[in-house]
């Protein structure tokens, strides 16, 4: 748990959206509007004191904000630029506010877990500014302490908020996050398309997020390389299965293949890895990772994402492709002295052989030969 008391959020939605025909805040995204996604991010993190600064096209935004029961303030100086909206937003904050999150309304992919991480850091370190960082790049929303409010409210700096925050760099703190959304905004139609793609894959880490997770958790190079090989086999198996009419999520199996041994070395590493990914909001991939050692197998069902990753993992040992027999014979030899371990290995082998048989029948190929061709 973390102390959300006296923390607020300011969303900036007063600008012109000059490079877009439509108001960016009102663009549709997953059945809601872009601005609703940002509001929901804070609400899901437990931040309820939210103010939206409106200006250009306020007449379109205000009815929606009323419907959402979100506070708003009108910036009559919106033509002067973003800093005027920031000043207006800070003016609207309750006097007892300790800090506020600042988010442009056209950044709808920020994860609620990122907001929680920033809040926890603020409670711990008491910095003037807490920045989320992804792959060494600072993004939004920064969490800005009340210590900065007087200088912001003067509103007379030519350098805007950036200049104010730069003067306080000595008391800034960075929080590394697995959230590429902190860097993604909507400036162009191409950006909007990327945002839409990211939204529909929001429970699947991007390639960059996978690499950030590896780095943060100090995953060994051997495990990273194993994961990349499993991911490549899983991806190509999924593509081939989809060609004959299945509907395997290629992006999900690729990410899960990479990350399946994230917690390798810990007891019940599959379940632990799944819990870690679930905590960061990657629910779909978390389920696949959690099942990669032991999964429920419906022999009458067609292979799904979990089955594809389970099988791909069993076809890789060390840095090479092996058969199911080779993979499990080595394990049987290693744990021959433990009857309990041997029973578990036999169960896993039987499961892998059944999946392999189903896939080979569907594709009409030898899976080991295909795997060697695919890598």
What is each PLM-predicted segment?
Residues 4-55, 59:
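N-terminal glycine-rich phosphate-binding loop and ensuing alpha1 helix
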Residues 185, 197, 341-375:
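Charged phosphate-binding loop/patch that engages nucleotide di/tri-phosphates or the phosphate backbone
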């Amino acid at each position: 748990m973390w102390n959300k008391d006296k923390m607020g959020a300011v969303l900036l939605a007063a600008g012109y959206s000059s490079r877009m025909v439509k108001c960016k805040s009102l663009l549709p995204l997953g059945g809601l509007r872009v601005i609703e996604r940002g509001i929901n991010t804070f609400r899901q993190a437990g931040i309820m004191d939210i103010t939206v600064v409106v200006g250009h096209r306020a007449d379109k935004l205000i009815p929606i904000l009323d419907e959402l029961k979100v506070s708003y303030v009108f910036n009559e100086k919106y033509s002067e630029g973003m800093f005027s909206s920031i000043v207006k937003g800070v003016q609207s904050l309750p006097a007892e506010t300790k800090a506020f999150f600042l988010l442009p309304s056209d950044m709808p992919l920020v994860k609620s877990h990122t907001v929680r991480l920033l809040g926890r850091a603020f409670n711990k370190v008491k910095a003037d500014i807490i920045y989320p960082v992804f792959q060494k790049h600072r993004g939004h929303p920064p969490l800005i302490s009340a210590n900065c409010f007087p200088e912001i409210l003067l509103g007379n700096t030519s350098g805007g908020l950036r200049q104010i925050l730069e003067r306080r760099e000595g008391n800034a703190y960075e929080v590394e996050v697995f959230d590429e959304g902190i860097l993604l905004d909507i400036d162009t139609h191409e950006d909007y398309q990327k945002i839409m793609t990211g939204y529909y894959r929001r429970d699947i880490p991007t390639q960059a997020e996978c690499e950030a997770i590896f780095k943060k958790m100090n995953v060994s190079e051997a495990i990273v390389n194993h994961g990349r090989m499993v991911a490549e086999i899983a991806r190509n198996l999924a593509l081939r299965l989809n060609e004959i009419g299945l509907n395997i999520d290629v992006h999900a199996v690729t990410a899960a293949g990479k990350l399946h041994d994230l917690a390798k070395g810990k007891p019940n590493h599959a379940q632990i890895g799944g819990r870690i990914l679930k905590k960061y909001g990657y629910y779909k991939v978390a389920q696949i990772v959690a099942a990669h050692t032991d999964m429920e197998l419906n022999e009458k069902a067609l292979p799904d994402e979990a089955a594809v990753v389970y099988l791909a993992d069993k076809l890789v040992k060390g840095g090479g492709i092996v058969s199911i027999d080779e993979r499990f014979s080595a394990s049987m030899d290693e744990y021959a002295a433990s009857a309990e371990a041997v029973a578990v290995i036999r169960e896993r082998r039987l499961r892998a052989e059944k999946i392999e048989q189903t896939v080979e029948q569907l594709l009409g190929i030898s899976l080991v030969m295909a795997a060697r061709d695919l890598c």
